[in-house]
Amino acid sequence: MKRTKKYPFLTLQRQRFHLNFENASSAAGIPAERDFYRWAWSALKNEYRRADISLILLDEEEARAYNRDYRGKDYATNVLSFALNEGEILPCQVSEKLYGDLIICPQVVLKEAAEQGKTPEQHFAHLTIHGTLHLMGYDHIEDDEAEIMEAEEIRLMRAAGFPNPYQED
């Protein structure tokens, strides 16, 4: 009996996870699309049976406009999360389907990675996981919420082969 290779995207399709990926950024040094799939799925797989997420990479000016228009902050940020079914479910509750949008600004991510002594891949992974957790209802406004979210980020980053994103060298 001939064995066939197992490809991650096939597993993702069976789990009904759809990531609509768009790179509208001019930045170089961005990880492959499949990496973003893998990182987002790692956060989702234990809590959602199905998900439909758009992940868009935008240059600083567009990311700044979204941050200004939706959060009232006039600067480009690393990641923005827009949960389309926000408030319908609780974190850690298995749901039928999650819908949401992630916007990542590669220029900000690359600058932060250099400043923090991280690899670009590590920082993109962290922010993809971080943003996906926000879509799932996690937050870090209150200290107790931040502890829960950061613990989950650390666990997922370690599972992906990366160090604790909050540990300084």
From Swiss-Prot:
Q: Gene3D superfamilies from the xrefs?
A: Metalloproteases ('zincins'), catalytic domain
| Record-level Gene Ontology MF annotations | metalloendopeptidase activity; RNA endonuclease activity; zinc ion binding
On cofactor binding, the record's note says: Binds 1 zinc ion.
Instruction: Print the keywords alphabetically.
Output: Cytoplasm, Endonuclease, Hydrolase, Metal-binding, Nuclease, Ribosome biogenesis, rRNA processing, Zinc
- A GO CC term assigned to this protein in UniProt: cytoplasm
Identify the residues that bind Zn(2+): 130, 134, 140
**Gene Ontology biological process:** rRNA processing
Q: What does this protein do?
A: Single strand-specific metallo-endoribonuclease involved in late-stage 70S ribosome quality control and in maturation of the 3' terminus of the 16S rRNA.
UniProt lists the family membership as follows: Belongs to the endoribonuclease YbeY family.
Q: What is this protein called?
A: Endoribonuclease YbeY
- Species classification: Bacteria, Pseudomonadati, Pseudomonadota, Betaproteobacteria, Neisseriales
- Encoded by which gene? ybeY
